[in-house]
Amino acid sequence: MTKVKVSLRPIVHNVNLPTVLKTTILPGESTERLFIATQLGEIFYIGDGVIKTFLDIRHLIIKLGTFEEGVSSSGYDERGLLGLAFHPQFYQNGLFYLHYSVAGTQGPGAFSEQFKPNPCDPKTLNLKWFNRNTQYDHIDTVEEWTLQSNGQAQKRRTLLNVRRPFFNHNGVN
């Protein structure tokens, strides 16, 4: 059996809370680039050995670490920039899609009292979420964006807004 020597080397430093890694070819280029999206709302790509900013939507992202009353705040949060997808014809049309938790949409939470499930008491399990219009943690959105010919990204339209009951388990690419 042939022995294979494998090693790792960092390709980027100081990228906090990465949530998505994707590759694509930018319009007008011929080299595939690695894109890194962060939970905080920054999207970077690596080009020519240098990390560059593709898009910064931190001002559009909900303030992480803020929760409804009754939820312990340990600093852990699963909201933020959760998804990045490039259109199959991104090279030609410049379309891409973002999924993120919207700034300013912090709600009161899904339940009027703290949720304390007890595995020995079936009445405390599988609670139903009754009033989605007023009792929610935040709103997630899916948006279509376009990369313009000048290299700047611009939002085209909102495709979906969803009220989420909790700050966690909101999905990632």
Task: Please report, for each region that a protein language model flagged, where it lies by residue.
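Acidic, Gly/Ser/Thr-rich repeat motifs that build Ca2+-stabilized beta-propeller blades
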Residues: 1-173
